């Protein structure tokens, strides 16, 4: 009996090695059930969804190149005499950090290219994060249930900014040292504890002997570790919540229309990773960035002219450059408002985008889950707020480079500074009003297209001599896209008296919420969609085409 029972297994033969490994792993990790649940997960297809992937792939490139650079970088401020390959600096005294960075650039095989890739990838990572978050903001992808994922993305952006700052400060060149000096001045402006924080960070009086080693630990361990955890959590929530999608035929809040993870999306993502890596490598090979050998080592008594931080920190410098040099002297102490006030505004500018999802949820009272994205024009108030924030950001970027604007365009630096000061307050208001009006105009245009069709460019002469332009009807897909958005009613305070005729108390918070809700969904904030009756009347021949 045993011989007969074992005969089928002998005829089948031994399973392939890959299958045996998979069976072994499944018996211990349960990968079959995990793969079954996620490998056929559907991802919608839209170019804007690739922005998040640019961030992910740039982060991977940063880690890979960063590991290589750590093998040769010496995070020490000990003074050494340089005897490397770069002749103009031979015999100069400099820190080990600066000398090792020169060695990476000129003596390590491929070192300069890796340095450039690392720096360019960091810039592209932060630019991708910035644009990705703006896409999420303007399309309303932060709404329930994705508020936590929005905060994860916000923290990744902020931590990425500080990781980049600590990274380009490590070479201890004159430009990075100027940035460190800038940071030290901001820290010293903090009342009471500023001096203690500065001494702790630098290990004594600036520049001290410890900040490179401390920044090194923060740059390669602390911040990347936190960012990696946030990134994993961000991706897990993307899988858990399912991907958002733009409105279209067959698309609802309960489904996702697109391609499966395997094999289509995986193949596309793999190719896109190598495309991003290739583009960054080409840019790094032909465009020099941070040429520390041309700047020289840092000296506390020197400063670079035209010194600029990386673009993502430019708005913080703009805050300080345009702030008047006000001071308050009291009881033997000086409060430097010219630095301390910008130091307070800096986190507020960033926090404004972090808390916005919760503010909008409270104002609108909308507690439903949203998986269909908005077109920015259909949320004019939100879009106007976003453009106003961008206006503040870019105005401050101009302020951060006021000296370069002045020298390149032969302008008065004082005129630029005053322009930025005024635009900081006036610009967001003008941008808000203009953006909201543009969105409403686009809504009217969409309504007209639904009712009358698209202009064909064909001019027709009627029998009685009148000239008209022929309009072509939209496809069903286009009609669905232009009319699929929901239009909400503003929140109301309700009756002023209760059921007994007694005047009901209405809190100031309720009144504020009602007014803000009116600004979101009131008559002046959305154009009514065309009704079925209007559409039938036009398309049945009563309208004028």
From Swiss-Prot:
Free-text comment on the cofactor: Binds 2 heme groups non-covalently per subunit.
Cofactor: heme
Catalytic activity: a quinol + 2 Fe(III)-[cytochrome c](out) = a quinone + 2 Fe(II)-[cytochrome c](out) + 2 H(+)(out)
GO CC aspect terms: membrane; plasma membrane
Annotated TM spans: 54-74, 122-142, 150-170, 182-202, 220-240, 269-289, 335-355, 385-405, 413-433
Location of the protein in the cell: Cell membrane
Membrane topology term: Multi-pass membrane protein
Disulfide bonding pattern of the chain: none
GO BP, sorted A to Z: respiratory electron transport chain
Quaternary data: The cytochrome bc1 complex is composed of a cytochrome b (QcrB), the Rieske iron-sulfur protein (QcrA) and a diheme cytochrome c (QcrC) subunit.
Family, similarity comment: Belongs to the cytochrome b family.
Name assigned to this protein: Cytochrome bc1 complex cytochrome b subunit
């Amino acid at each position: 009996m045993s011989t007969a029972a074992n005969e089928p297994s002998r005829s089948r033969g031994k399973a392939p090695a890959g299958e045996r490994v998979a069976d072994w792993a499944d018996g211990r990790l349960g990968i079959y059930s995990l793969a079954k649940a996620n490998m056929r997960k559907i991802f919608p297809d839209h170019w804007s969804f690739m922005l998040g992937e640019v961030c992910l792939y740039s982060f991977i490139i940063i880690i890979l190149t960063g590991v290589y650079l750590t093998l040769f970088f010496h995070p020490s401020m000990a003074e050494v005499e340089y005897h490397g390959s770069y002749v103009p600096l031979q015999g100069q005294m400099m820190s080990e950090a600066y000398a090792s960075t020169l060695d990476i650039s000129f003596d390590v095989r491929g070192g300069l290219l890796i340095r450039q890739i690392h720096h360019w990838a960091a810039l592209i990572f932060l630019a991708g994060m910035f644009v990705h978050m703006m896409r999420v903001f303007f399309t309303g992808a932060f709404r329930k249930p994705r508020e936590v994922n929005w905060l994860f993305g916000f923290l990744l952006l902020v931590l990425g900014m500080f990781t980049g700052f600590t990274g380009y400060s490590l070479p201890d060149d004159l430009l990075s040292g100027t940035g460190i000096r800038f940071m030290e001045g901001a820290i010293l402006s903090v009342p009471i504890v500023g001096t203690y924080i500065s001494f702790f960070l630098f290990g004594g009086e600036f520049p001290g002997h410890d900040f490179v080693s401390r920044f090194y630990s923060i740059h390669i361990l602390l911040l990347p570790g936190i960012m990696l955890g946030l990134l994993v959590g961000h991706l897990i929530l993307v899988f858990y919540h399912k991907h958002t999608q733009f409105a279209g035929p067959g698309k609802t809040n309960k489904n996702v229309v697109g391609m499966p993870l395997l094999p289509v999306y995986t193949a596309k993502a793999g190719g896109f990773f190598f495309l991003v890596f290739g583009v960054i490598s080409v840019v790094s090979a032909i465009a020099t960035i941070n040429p520390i050998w041309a700047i020289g080592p840092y000296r506390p008594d020197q400063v670079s002219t035209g010194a600029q931080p990386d673009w993502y920190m430019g708005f913080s410098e703009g805050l300080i450059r345009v702030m008047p040099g006000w001071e308050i002297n009291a009881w033997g102490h000086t409060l430097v408002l010219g630095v301390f006030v910008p130091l307070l505004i800096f986190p507020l500018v960033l926090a404004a985008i972090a808390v916005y999802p919760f503010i909008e949820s409270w104002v609108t009272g909308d507690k439903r889950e949203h998986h269909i994205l908005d077109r920015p024009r259909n949320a004019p108030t939100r879009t106007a707020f976003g453009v106003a924030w961008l206006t503040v950001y870019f105005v401050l970027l101009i302020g951060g480079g006021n000296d370069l604007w002045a020298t390149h365009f032969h302008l008065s630096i004082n005129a630029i500074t005053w322009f930025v000061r005024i635009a900081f307050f006036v610009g967001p208001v003008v941008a808000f009003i203009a953006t909201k009006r543009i969105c409403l105009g686009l809504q009217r245009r969409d309504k007209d297209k639904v009712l009358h069709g698209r202009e064909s460019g064909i001019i027709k002469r009627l029998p009685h001599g009148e000239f008209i332009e022929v309009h072509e009807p939209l496809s069903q897909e286009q009609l669905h896209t232009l009319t699929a958005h929901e239009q909400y009613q503003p929140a109301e305070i309700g009756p002023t008296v209760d059921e007994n005729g007694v005047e009901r108390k209405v809190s100031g918070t309720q009144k504020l919420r009602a007014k803000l809700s009116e600004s979101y969904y009131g008559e002046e904030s959305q154009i009514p969609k065309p009704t079925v009756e209007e559409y039938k009347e036009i398309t049945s021949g009563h309208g004028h085409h």
